[in-house]
């Protein structure tokens, strides 16, 4: 199953260039339900609300502290780690 996430252009470009290998979501009940109610194998990133997308294989989804330079806040977040583009 594929998880679809909308990204701002800046973060989309970083992933596209291979500079970012994690995406972050708030540690809130909404994201807990959304991320763990299905067994996701892939993540599809959308550049803002356009039709431009790219899909990657998910390595893991966990809770922790992300990298500030990749847009993570200073508190615990859901970390979606991904590997190669499909």
For each feature predicted by the language model, list its residue ranges:
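Catalytic phosphate/metal-binding cores of nucleic-acid and nucleotide-processing enzymes, i.e., regions
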Residues: 1-86
């Amino acid at each position: 199953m594929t998880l679809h996430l909308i990204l701002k252009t800046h973060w989309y470009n970083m992933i596209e260039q291979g500079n970012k290998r994690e995406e972050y979501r708030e540690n809130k009940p909404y994201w807990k339900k959304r991320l763990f109610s299905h067994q996701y194998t892939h993540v599809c990133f959308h550049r803002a609300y356009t039709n431009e997308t790219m899909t990657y294989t998910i390595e893991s989804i966990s809770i922790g502290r992300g990298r500030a330079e990749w847009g993570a806040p200073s508190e615990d977040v859901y970390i979606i780690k991904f590997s190669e583009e499909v």
